[in-house]
Amino acid sequence: MKVIDKIQSLADEGKTAFSFEFFPPKTEDGVDNLFERMDRMVAYGPTFCDITWGAGGSTADLTLDIASRMQNVVCVESMMHLTCTNMPVEKIDHALETIRSNGIQNVLALRGDPPHGQDKFVQVEGGFDCALDLVNHIRSKYGDYFGITVAGYPEAHPDVIGENGLASNEAYQSDLEYLKKKIDAGADLIVTQLFYDTDIFLKFVNDCRQIGISCPIVPGIMPINNYRGFLRMTGFCKTKIPVEVMAALEPIKDNEEAVKAYGIHLGTEMCKKMLAHGVKSLHLYTLNMEKSALAILMNLGMIDESKISRSLPWRRPANVFRTKEDVRPIFWANRPKSYISRTKGWEDFPQGRWGDSRSASYGALSDHQFSRPRARDKKLQQEWVVPLKSVEDIQEKFKELCLGNLKSSPWSELDGLQPETRIINEQLIKVNSKGFLTINSQPSVNAERSDSPTVGWGGPVGYVYQKAYLEFFCSKEKLDAVVEKCKALPSITYMAVNKGEQWVSNTAQADVNAVTWGVFPAKEIIQPTIVDPASFNVWKDEAFETWSRSWANLYPEADPSRNLLEEVKNSYYLVSLVENDYINGDIFAVFADL
């Protein structure tokens, strides 16, 4: 979806939009850390996030990769910066085609800074001289597909700011006229350069309106995190620093925490003033840091840590090709990135109902599904690599996870227990103690308010429902006991399969069981999570392979612990259990006296 449409839609509802900017890190570890940070920040619901294009096009490939992952894996509306520096038209079109094929609709069109080692911008052969040319090219070749954002400079472009820190009135007016040309050429949104004098920004907005620029103008806010970095950035951008800001910073410049606290205070007060003057959107330059940006938004009452809303039980995709997707199998609940990877080749995505089995079109299992950020790999090493002498030792690790003592799990891309799991963690501990090794679960829910902090989704003024669900590994003997117990519990359905494809089930292969649904005003019933045998048959390969790829392989070859884990993988069954009576049923009754 175009950012301009999202901003205008929120404005029509009387809401203020906010967004974050990130830049490509220099190291692989830095990229991993950035995506973990993005995951946390995107949970607060930014309207979009953008990723910069390195000076001189130095990060072109990485920017393209990060933008695509933001849109398709982090699931946030993404805007990619695109510059003219060192970019002949063929490279520009390659970048645009790449993001279009990945479902991205938003571009920030810039001239760009001079290449490394040069003082002035030089047009590359076969390329463009300015952002206006880039806007014209995008509109002429790609029509209305892309939303185009351009940069605005409240103090004028740094190139025309003199040694005295000011641009002449003639240069400032010329800059405004050039900005209007970019809008007239097809740009539909302006995001400004950083500033610290709010009055300058408000004057800039008024000056734009006076010459006929009517599109939204979004202020770019850069929280002060570090004194030297602040001076370096304002010096590079030739940004005016108000006297009172320097006076406040000077006594605390060597106290980094005090500088950050002042930066949060200043950013908050700047935003309050702009919001009071009718600004409807804020863009935060994060410098890949989260605390200051989030603190400002919390101070403004725009986000609340205790009320992170979800449109669905899983994060809704931002990819233009998946925006209507609203049904998924529960099996990948803790591995959403893997699910997105394995379904990226689909031409249509389920909407409203799961429909016919589509197992044949799941992507093949590959190394990609088991690749992990180094930080997560390290966490698994620290928490899960212990001497394992018996199955009881394995059970102990699962119990520790249910107790909340572990922040990682080989079967999860998420951190620790999810809020709804904590509702049933005492029962889960007992189940794991009996040798049923749980990897996925949800409690039963009967008409809980949709804004509940633990199980809510879909926004306010609705009610959500869940059937209790449990997924676990167990031995053949324990499975036989479960099957026997279920004969006296007709509301429970089960499926079980081992690595050798031996099935045990009391459901038909074509059965599709909705296990989560919601009721909202003026809408049909939404059922975003289902259980179906065909998808379970696909998932089971990934679940069994996780024993090796994400746990056993952390040990040296021939290590007894590694061998034990492989034995469990090769002999245990994966079991899916649903308690269909979500009002009076008790899924844990299956395990009583076992």
Curated annotation (Swiss-Prot):
Cofactor field = FAD
UniProt-listed GO biological process terms: methionine metabolic process; tetrahydrofolate interconversion
Activity regulation comment: Plant MTHFRs strongly prefer NADH over NADPH. Not inhibited by methionine or S-adenosylmethionine.
**Which terms in the GO cellular component ontology are assigned?**
cytosol
Alphabetical keyword list: FAD, Flavoprotein, NAD, Oxidoreductase
Q: Keyword check for Flavoprotein, yes or no.
A: yes
* Reactions performed catalytically: (6S)-5-methyl-5,6,7,8-tetrahydrofolate + NAD(+) = (6R)-5,10-methylene-5,6,7,8-tetrahydrofolate + NADH + H(+)
The domain of life is Eukaryota
EC number of the protein: 1.5.1.54
Pathway of this protein?
One-carbon metabolism; tetrahydrofolate interconversion
Residues binding NAD(+):
21-26, 52-53
The active site of this protein is located at 21
| Assembly information from the UniProt record | Homodimer.
Q: What is this protein called?
A: Methylenetetrahydrofolate reductase (NADH) 2
| Native species | Arabidopsis thaliana (Mouse-ear cress)
> What is the primary gene name for this protein?
MTHFR2
